[in-house]
């Protein structure tokens, strides 16, 4: 049966150390098999390393890195007639954050450093300087949207 009213997104509790909902969401994205305490120790260790390296406050450095990875446009497949077009669409703010976090975690997991905390710190450091695999992923998505700008009128 269809829902009659729009469901409210679940309220997420802010993380215990910095009091940031964004960081709590990031910890949840990193978490594997429900092991939140391990995910928290990885993230806090990475932020500690990041703040020592950049000289900025940990949360501020994290937000800069995330801002550099967030996509503004993406492509969605749309079938028109017999062919499928990659139609560029703007990304909603919540999805923007979710994609940015997911890309940072994926890029950190693919790195070859010793510990996950170090990998995450290096990826966040690269992202804050507009380089690294996560930023490259965003550039690829933007390039794809730019290349398919001609199909923007198929937007729905």
Curated annotation (Swiss-Prot):
One of its GO terms (cellular component) is small ribosomal subunit. GO terms for biological process: translation. InterPro entries: Ribosomal_uS7, Ribosomal_uS7_bac/org-type, Ribosomal_uS7_CS, Ribosomal_uS7_dom, Ribosomal_uS7_dom_sf. One of its GO terms (molecular function) is structural constituent of ribosome. Keywords: Ribonucleoprotein, Ribosomal protein, RNA-binding, rRNA-binding, tRNA-binding. Part of the 30S ribosomal subunit. Contacts proteins S9 and S11. NCBIfam families: rpsG_bact. One of the primary rRNA binding proteins, it binds directly to 16S rRNA where it nucleates assembly of the head domain of the 30S subunit. Is located at the subunit interface close to the decoding center, probably blocks exit of the E-site tRNA. Belongs to the universal ribosomal protein uS7 family. This is Small ribosomal subunit protein uS7. Pfam families: Ribosomal_S7 (PF00177).
């Amino acid at each position: 049966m269809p829902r009659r009213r729009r469901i409210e997104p679940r309220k997420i509790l802010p993380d215990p150390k910095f009091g940031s909902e964004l960081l709590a969401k990031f910890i949840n994205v990193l978490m594997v098999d429900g092991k939140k305490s391990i995910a928290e120790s990885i993230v806090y260790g990475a932020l500690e390393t990041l703040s020592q390296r950049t000289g900025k406050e940990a949360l501020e450095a994290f937000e800069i890195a995330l801002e550099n990875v967030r996509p503004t446009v993406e492509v969605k497949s749309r079938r028109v007639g017999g062919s499928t077009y990659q139609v560029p669409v703007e990304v909603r703010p919540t999805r923007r954050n979710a994609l940015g976090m997911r890309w940072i975690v994926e890029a950190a997991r693919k790195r070859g450093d010793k510990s996950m905390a170090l990998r995450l710190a290096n990826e966040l450091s690269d992202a804050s300087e507009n380089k690294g695999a996560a930023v490259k992923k965003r550039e690829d998505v933007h390039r794809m949207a730019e290349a398919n700008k001609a199909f923007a009128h198929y937007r729905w």
